[in-house]
Amino acid sequence: MARRWSTKESQRRGSAWLLLFLAGVYGNGALAELSENVHISGVSTACGESPEQIRAPSGIITSPGWPSDYPAQVNCSWLIRANPGEIITISFQDFDIQGSRRCTLDWLTIETYKNIESYRACGSTIPPPYISSQDHVWIRFHSDDSVSRKGFRLAYFSGKSEQPDCACDQFRCGNGKCIPEAWKCNSMDECGDSSDEEVCASDAHPPTTTAFQPCAYNQFQCLSRFTKVYTCLPESLKCDGNIDCLDLGDEIDCDMPTCGQWLKYFYGTFNSPNYPDFYPPGSNCTWLIDTGDHRKVILRFTDFKLDGTGYGDYVKIYDGLEENPRKLLRVLTAFDSHAPLTVVSSSGQIRVHFCADKVNAARGFNATYQVDGFCLPWEIPCGGNWGCYTEQQRCDGYWHCPNGRDEINCTMCQKEEFPCSRNGVCYPRSDRCNYQNHCPNGSDEKNCFFCQPGNFHCKNNRCVFESWVCDSQDDCGDGSDEENCPVIVPTRVITAAVIGSLICGLLLVIALGCTCKLYSLRMFERRSFETQLSRVEAELLRREAPPSYGQLIAQGLIPPVEDFPVCSPNQASVLENLRLAVRSQLGFTSIRLPMTGRSSNIWNRIFNFARSRHSGSLALVSGDGDEVVPSQSSSRETERSRPHRSLFSVESDDTDTENERRDTAGASGGVAAPLPQKVPPTTAVEATVGSGGNSSAQSTRGGHADGREVSSVEAPSVSPARHQLTSALSRMTQGLRWVRFTLGRSSSTTQNRSPLRQLDTAVSGREDDDDVEMLIPVSDGASDIDANDCSRPLLDLASDQVQGFRQPHSAGNPGVRTSNRDGPCERCGIVHTAQIPDTCLEATVKTETSDDEALLLC
């Protein structure tokens, strides 16, 4: 019996070592031989918060607990990464997941991109192979809290889509892709072009299932995982914790060994079944520790090694005797395979539960417990409540006592120095547990029950810098430095946000500036189009109509023709009609045409009006001599206060009807009557100017010779009237000189001006004045003027200052016509409107008068 046990133990140990280097791929009776870079799925972070990252070129992934039922409410994920430029091929070998419509209960997904599903499967049908388009693949498995099934088992292989040649254990597809030889003729298209299934019709045959002799009563039939053929194995290899059969038939449906006990002492020990040998698969043990003391219980695992294949084996430790999830202290798995492991309860009671799956096994664990402050019989107290240490732990280079008592005075180290190991290297206490290795083997940073100031103590008795706590990186190795961290935005994120905000603000300011600049340029262009024309452009664009034929004849520029209308006692001339129309529209007000847009300036208009009164400028339209003069002065003042009544064109007067002319009031409010004949008083002329009188007399006699009627009314011999006439003639002489000088200077710049334009010096000499005045020619109806003289326009007396001269003259001698502008020149007998001959100017009396008085024009 002892010999048999020895043989079984040796076989068990050999199988355990083989499991560390070999892995079988179970699928349709075929076995793929994988290299040392093969990944075998086990208990890992795949079913935790983060996915398990796999970088091996090939491997096997199984669901938790396969081939047993997977647990409920699990979420596992794997991330397979291949080399750049390679693709990943996944082939399912076993698949049994709870089925549902659209796979909403339990499901398996394969994704090329995270959170973007490209493949979802459930049920009992083996899915077809999956060939990725990228160098990475996400695999996710989910189960609900209802039905559980066997799960899945898949194999993956990564390589280039086209390769010139393949390895000896690989098959080259028709498209140049390489796959494992075991995938050939397995009724699945792993190549993508079905070339691995084309040559299977003739040579394909099922795995070796030839008949063999029945096994003995103490043997069982098994498909050997080593020879790939069915063989008979002794019953002793069944349920021994070692997998001998390819289908795991020797380790399935084994009876659970009884283990566990109730511990009621202040200290004690316990271990896994068969320790230090492998514990049986499917072990399920519970230890209840009740010291009967209120003090804490210290549980220490001196040796710990669990299996990690499948869902894995675990040890759960509870604070108390109840299996209460809220009082779970710690869960130990295959990833905690390091010693010592210490767990401290809050009371004198602890519950330890060990569970193993039915796949493979490991050495197990050995644990001790004791009440805080007590030591085991074979231990040495560290002093106070610092714990205990064994003789083997004395001077081994590792602190088993928090105060380092087990490492004091061990070697040739100085006082307050500790050895790194037995090689004689020492370090001071200040270098202990400061996250800086001073010993070659790092013993100064192991078993750190306390850390130096500025360091953080991890749950696995390691020390890290405090600045590394809650930095989103696992520096402790167990994630304890990232637990219970407040949600704080990293400084880098804040800096990036501030810089981004500044850049965005700067771009916004630049955009606003550009927008404002473009808007200003646009408005400037629009204003440039809307700007009023300058005075020069206005003069060039606003051409005046050429003078009429009658005006040219009246000015003496062309000789008269026979068929042109002439003045007669019974018919008014065309110019007289024009004069009457303008007078009816303006009410004896001077026509003032705006030169530029600045005519709206009231101050310039007031200034020009004052200048016209004091500088000798003449109004162009006046009332008749027979009309009441006092009302004319008040009417002129009233009309001057109307700035827009003068804005009428001369051409518009020709369209007035006869009724409008008849009904339009003149200066005195009546209808404008034909002008009376004018005979210059001979006595007054002779008294004033000799030569001028002779000329006037000759002109008068010439008129009588032609048969024209002349008024017989003579001028009164009253001395005041003669004095006023003399003063008026003197002022007329000065005005004629001024007009000659002005017209001579502006003749070169006003060639295109109409005779109806102004003769004001302010307008003809400068372009800055705003208003111009028109001289309206009139026609006299006297019969003593010949046809040529009647065709010429007559000047009207426009100065308000001569009213005193005209009123007494008319009042004293109603039969005699007062001296005004409506008449021929005393010198030549012609009515001058634009230019006055030099002979007429030389014949006038050179009498200087005040500028404040009105000037009479010939």
Swiss-Prot record:
Residues 33-492 are extracellular. Disulfide bonds join 47-76, 103-122, 166-178, 173-191, 185-200, 215-232, 222-245, 239-254, 259-285, 375-388, 382-401, 395-410, 413-426, 420-439, 433-448, 451-463, 458-476, 470-485. Residues 619-721, 746-767 are annotated as: Disordered. GO terms for cellular component: clathrin-coated pit; plasma membrane. Residues 165-201, 214-255, 374-411, 412-449, 450-486 form the LDL-receptor class A domain. Residues 712-721 have a biased composition (Low complexity). SMART domains: CUB, LDLa. Residues 514-858 are cytoplasmic. One of its GO terms (biological process) is neuron projection development. It holds the Pfam family CUB. It is a single-pass type I membrane protein. GO terms for molecular function: integrin binding. It is found in: Membrane; Membrane, Coated pit. Glycans are attached at residues 75, 284, 366, 409, 441. Residues 746-755 have a biased composition (Polar residues). Keywords: Coated pit, Disulfide bond, Endocytosis, Glycoprotein, Membrane, Receptor, Repeat, Signal, Transmembrane, Transmembrane helix. Residues 1-32 form the signal peptide. Residues 47-159, 259-372 form the CUB domain. The chain crosses the membrane at residues 493-513. May interact with RACK1, ZFYVE9 and NMRK2. Probable receptor, which may be involved in the internalization of lipophilic molecules and/or signal transduction. May act as a tumor suppressor. Belongs to the LDLR family. This is Low-density lipoprotein receptor-related protein 12. The gene is Lrp12.
